[in-house]
Every structure is written in structure tokens, then in C-alpha cells.
Amino acid sequence: MTDEQIYAFCDANKDDIRCKCIYPDKSIVRIGIDTRLPYYCWYEPCKRSDALLPASLKKNITKCNVSDCTISLGNVSITDSKLDVNNVCDSKRVATENIAVRYLNQEIRYPIIDIKWLPIGLLALAILILAFF
């Protein structure tokens, strides 16, 4: 399709998922502004194989230097100390490692002196200082 045909189709079908890269929601554009990363570099409809993209947008997308990673936790089992992590970042490394599991330190350490005695102690200290100086 030519750029004119793409724009004509998307003008008539703004809610079509294939046109969402040309007409994204305002919230998507705002996220792009806030992160200082153009929305077309990370917005999923722009990555679709059937997305309708004019030539200028295709050119801009090729200049994106973003690694789009999807990391998901798979089988998490505390009893077997096993953690499967699925990393989809164009890397081919697959590692299965056993992780040592230990309980958190949950000891409660109480102060030596109760906090309610602090003002009385400070007052007594001030009286002693005033009495001797």
C-alpha cells in the first residue's frame, strides 16, 4: 500500500489495531513524552507484522535503539529451591540454577531503655547541667 492509501484507510478506521501506530491513544503519546522515548519504539501495535506504517514512520522505527525485553517467571518452587526465568531479549542463554533459600531474620530487638523515659532523662540531665554550671 502507498502512504496515501494507508492514511486514507486509517482515517476511516482509526480503531483498527493496524492503525494504532499512526493514531495512538493520547496516554501512549504522553508516556512516550514522559520517558523521552518515542512511542513507536516500544508500542506493541507498531511492532505487528500487519501494522500499516507509512514510509516516514518505518524509517523512524529503524532508528530506535531499544531492547524490548519480556522477562517472565515460570516455575517458582520454594521447597525445591528452583527458579525458572524466561528471558526474551534476543539472547540465547538458558540457565537453570538452584538458589539457596533461607528464612528472613525476624528477631525483634527491643531498646535497652523504654522510650517513655527519654524526656524525663533529658530533663534530669538539663537540671544537673544548670545546677553545676
UniProtKB/Swiss-Prot annotation:
The keyword Transmembrane helix applies. It is a single-pass membrane protein. Envelope protein part of the entry-fusion complex responsible for the virus membrane fusion with host cell membrane during virus entry. Also plays a role in cell-cell fusion (syncytium formation). GO terms for cellular component: membrane; viral envelope; virion membrane. One of its GO terms (biological process) is symbiont entry into host cell. Part of a stable entry-fusion complex (EFC) which is at least composed of proteins A16, A21, A28, G3, G9, H2, J5, and L5. Formation of the viral membrane is necessary for the assembly of the complex. It comes from the Viruses. It holds the Pfam family Pox_G9-A16. This is Protein J5. Keywords: Fusion of virus membrane with host cell membrane, Fusion of virus membrane with host membrane, Membrane, Signal-anchor, Transmembrane, Transmembrane helix, Viral envelope protein, Viral penetration into host cytoplasm, Virion, Virus entry into host cell. It is found in: Virion membrane. The chain crosses the membrane at residues 112-132. It comes from Vaccinia virus (strain Ankara) (VACV). Belongs to the poxviridae A16/G9/J5 family. Residues 1-111 are virion surface. Its main location: virion. InterPro entries: Pox_virus_G9/A16. The keyword Membrane applies.
